[in-house]
From Swiss-Prot:
Pfam families: DsrC (PF04358). The lineage of its organism: Bacteria, Pseudomonadati, Pseudomonadota, Gammaproteobacteria, Enterobacterales. One of its GO terms (biological process) is tRNA wobble position uridine thiolation. Keywords: Cytoplasm, Transferase, tRNA processing. Its main location: cytoplasm. NCBIfam families: dsrC_tusE_dsvC, PRK11508.1. The keyword Nucleotide-binding does not apply. This is Sulfurtransferase TusE. Part of a sulfur-relay system required for 2-thiolation of 5-methylaminomethyl-2-thiouridine (mnm(5)s(2)U) at tRNA wobble positions. Could accept sulfur from TusD.
Length: 109
């Protein structure tokens, strides 16, 4: 659980929001700080992309799917695991979905 703007926000044991409807961009900043990440425009691009992906497909993308979808939308420069790991060193799929307020990707350990 975390406290945000005087409210209790329920999370699972790994810090993923239990209710993605409670997510907001200011809350994302707090979640990112807890992950040791200062959100840059490049981070936001991925976070928003992951949220859009979830809204369209009703699932959080695992790393392989994330890389492929990012490459399709933004090109090879951003759609590769090296770029994504520079932004999210503990795992792009795991950290980006957590910061985006989404469930942990199914295929993430």
């Amino acid at each position: 659980m975390l406290i945000f703007e005087g409210k209790e926000i329920e999370t699972d044991t790994e810090g993923y929001l239990k209710e993605s409807s409670q997510w907001s961009e200011p809350l994302a900043v707090v979640i990112a700080e807890n992950e040791g990440i200062a959100l840059s425009p490049e981070h936001w691009e991925v976070v928003r992309f992951v949220r859009d992906f979830y809204l369209e497909f009703n699932t959080s993308p695992a790393i392989r799917m994330l890389v492929k979808a990012m490459a399709n939308k933004f090109g090879e420069e951003k759609g590769n695991s090296r770029y994504l790991y520079r932004l999210f060193p503990k795992g792009p799929a795991k950290q980006a979905t957590k910061i985006a307020g989404l469930p942990k990707p199914v295929k993430c350990i």
